[in-house]
Design a protein with these regions (language model features):
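Boundary regions of SH3-family modules and the immediately adjacent low-complexity/disordered segments
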Residues: 161-193, 200-203, 207, 231-250
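SH3/SH3-like beta-barrel superfamily modules
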Residues: 210-242
Length: 250
């Protein structure tokens, strides 16, 4: 019975490996095909291929970077900026995405949200890096505390190290919260419509607060039906039609 169960488990593992390998091979082939469409100047076809990969969950910084380039070549600066931002959300230090993002912003005259002073100081690392630091600090502190509990003599160095590890974990958790809730955090969205008006109320006839060029940044505060209430550049707030924006985080 044990031998039969082992054989079944082995067959399942082989099948799963084969399926996963086939899926990766297929996505690589589709990505290569999309790149070929782009190289041959068929940008709309390349966009369709890249978007299909994104919808299937095959996310990578290079996929969104290439998708941003394709949108840029069609003159859709809003979606170009959106996808450069998505590339940077996955890989913070992507120099090509940083450079092209700035070019697209200049072309579109897009408005940016200004980070708070705490965000500016914390932006040398990403949320993922702070999360890793928090987990590492927490577990190092736990091991030190367990060691102190069972040790015959409590070392001052071990106590200091465990305290330092807990401090690192706490500060890293605070950094994750600040960045996630900040101007570049989970609520960040990009204006994809053209000459979008932020209004005082949820009506097309309401007075305009600010005209937002494509690619402008907003921070979503709440949603009411087809409208989004958002923090805007220049420390303003207003209502925007949801169809004219897309969140950076998927």
């Amino acid at each position: 019975m044990k031998g039969r169960k082992l054989l079944v488990d082995l067959c399942c593992a082989v099948i799963c490996t084969f399926v996963a390998t086939s899926a990766f091979a297929q996505s690589d082939a589709e990505f290569t095909k999309a790149n070929q469409e782009y190289a041959q100047g068929r940008f709309k076809e390349a966009i369709d291929q890249y978007e299909a990969l994104a919808r299937s969950g095959q996310w990578s910084a290079n996929l969104f970077y290439d998708l941003g380039n394709a949108y840029f070549r069609t003159g859709d600066f809003g979606r170009a900026i959106l996808n450069y931002e998505r590339a940077l959300a996955l890989e913070r230090h992507h120099p090509e995405a940083v450079a092209n993002l700035q070019i697209a912003r200049d072309e579109a005259h897009a408005l940016e949200m200004q980070p708070s002073w705490s965000e500016r100081y914390l932006q040398f690392a990403s949320i993922n890096q702070y999360s890793i630091a928090a987990a590492a600090g927490f577990w190092v502190a736990i091991f030190c505390i367990v060691g102190l509990v069972f040790a015959r003599r409590r070392s001052a160095a071990a106590i200091a190290f465990s305290s330092f590890s807990l401090l690192v974990a706490a500060l890293s958790i605070l950094a994750v919260y600040q960045l996630d809730a900040g101007s570049k955090g989970r609520a960040l969205a990009i204006v994809t419509g053209k000459e979008v008006q932020a209004r005082l109320a949820t009506a097309d006839t309401a007075n305009s607060v600010l005209t937002l060029p494509p690619g402008s940044e907003i921070k979503i505060l709440s949603i009411r039906g087809d409208w989004i209430y958002a923090a805007l550049p220049n420390n303003l707030r207003g209502w925007i039609l949801a169809k004219d924006t897309e969140q950076v985080r998927l």
